[in-house]
């Protein structure tokens, strides 16, 4: 499947929603510390409901520790500074999709090391700055999953 990477997430409700999304899609979740909340935060638990046990979650102390542990072949950064739209990328099994913290995004020190074609964006209107983190993850996850034929999904309607 694919992997979602949250770089230093700050808002527990967003992370809880993303945990629930990962449980429902089979995508793995990586959390790069420091987190802006404690792991036992009741807001994290409430927003993720009882889905925490159904999601595969890995925590990493630093971005470098994440890279060393996972060795991603293709790591995409979702950023307002991206060039191709999320729907223009041809996702593959094994891809990693990284999202930055809610108030500041992925640091430029990381973005500057990435190829331009791996810095992707979600289209928005001219006056918009950014989208909510959990919404951005959901939009991108479902586009990637659609491209992969909803691998692992059940009860798919037949299209004629």
UniProtKB/Swiss-Prot annotation:
It comes from the Bacteria. The keyword Transport does not apply. Pfam families: SpoU_methylase (PF00588). GO terms for molecular function: identical protein binding; RNA binding; tRNA (5-carboxymethylaminomethyluridine(34)-2'-O)-methyltransferase activity; tRNA (cytidine(34)-2'-O)-methyltransferase activity. GO terms for biological process: wobble position cytosine ribose methylation; wobble position uridine ribose methylation. Methylates the ribose at the nucleotide 34 wobble position in the two leucyl isoacceptors tRNA(Leu)(CmAA) and tRNA(Leu)(cmnm5UmAA). Catalyzes the methyl transfer from S-adenosyl-L-methionine to the 2'-OH of the wobble nucleotide. Belongs to the class IV-like SAM-binding methyltransferase superfamily. RNA methyltransferase TrmH family. TrmL subfamily. PANTHER family: TRNA (CYTIDINE(34)-2'-O)-METHYLTRANSFERASE. This is tRNA (cytidine(34)-2'-O)-methyltransferase.
């Amino acid at each position: 499947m694919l992997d979602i990477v949250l770089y230093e997430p700050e808002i527990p409700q967003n992370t809880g929603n993303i945990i629930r999304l990962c449980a429902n899609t089979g995508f793995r979740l990586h959390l790069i510390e420091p987190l802006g909340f404690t792991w036992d935060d009741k807001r994290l638990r409430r927003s993720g409901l009882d889905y925490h046990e159904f999601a595969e979650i890995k925590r990493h102390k630093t971005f470098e520790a994440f890279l060393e542990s996972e060795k991603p072949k293709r790591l995409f950064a979702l950023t307002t500074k991206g060039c191709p739209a999320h729907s223009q990328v041809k996702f593959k099994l094994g891809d990693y999709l990284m999202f930055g913290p809610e108030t500041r995004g992925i640091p430029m020190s990381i973005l500057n090391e990435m190829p331009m074609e791996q810095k992707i964006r979600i289209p928005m209107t001219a006056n918009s700055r950014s989208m909510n983190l959990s919404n951005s993850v959901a939009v991108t996850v479902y586009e990637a999953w659609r491209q992969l034929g909803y691998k692992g999904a059940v009860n798919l309607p037949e299209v004629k």
